[in-house]
Swiss-Prot record:
Protein family per UniProt: Belongs to the HAD-like hydrolase superfamily. DOG/GPP family.
Protein name (record): 2-deoxyglucose-6-phosphate phosphatase 2
This protein's UniProt keywords: Hydrolase, Magnesium, Metal-binding
Chain's role: Phosphatase that is active on 2-deoxy-D-glucose 6-phosphate (2-DOG-6P), but not very active on fructose-1-P.
pH dependence: Optimum pH is 6.
Record's miscellaneous remark: Present with 2400 molecules/cell in log phase SD medium.
Amino acid sequence: MPQFSVDLCLFDLDGTIVSTTTAAESAWKKLCRQHGVDPVELFKHSHGARSQEMMKKFFPKLDNTDNKGVLALEKDMADNYLDTVSLIPGAENLLLSLDVDTETQKKLPERKWAIVTSGSPYLAFSWFETILKNVGKPKVFITGFDVKNGKPDPEGYSRARDLLRQDLQLTGKQDLKYVVFEDAPVGIKAGKAMGAITVGITSSYDKSVLFDAGADYVVCDLTQVSVVKNNENGIVIQVNNPLTRD
């Protein structure tokens, strides 16, 4: 099984850690009905994109001052469709395993992983207060409100990498290595643009779309990803039975 060594792990959230497609589509459809927008057309562009970009493109007359339109939409998702939200298989175990030294089995003093999502802080943080409560919100957590440029621009992932580098006192390390876990082609492209190894999850797109976007490995879910080694010197990740293009 293929293995690779990294210093940091960077995760998208929706579709990568948490399965939110039904909740997101339900809330967007409701908003589309209220404003006479074709949801089919919106869904061609929405996955992996920041909600504020979708608001500007499809709801130009909706008042989104201070992102209040986005917050209302994503509050609707979190408050009214929580029963449709679930964890991507293997996600919780993978995140928890990244917090433990494999040699001593003790909890590491600092987390080596971060979240980079296109969602709002309200929606993204809410999952760590509900279905990801056992994991807890990581210190480095980049949302769509923290960047000027959304995916496929690498700004979000680059910012998370730099913050982790600082927290872990790795600023002097020249050959820093990192992996990005993503379910959307725009996210895969963002990861590749900042020099990361990329692992695509087929929760939202066919494997061919993820490979075409540049994914180095593609899996069905995170049960196929395991931490072989994790200590102060780095992380060794194993991808079990990765999908192939054929």
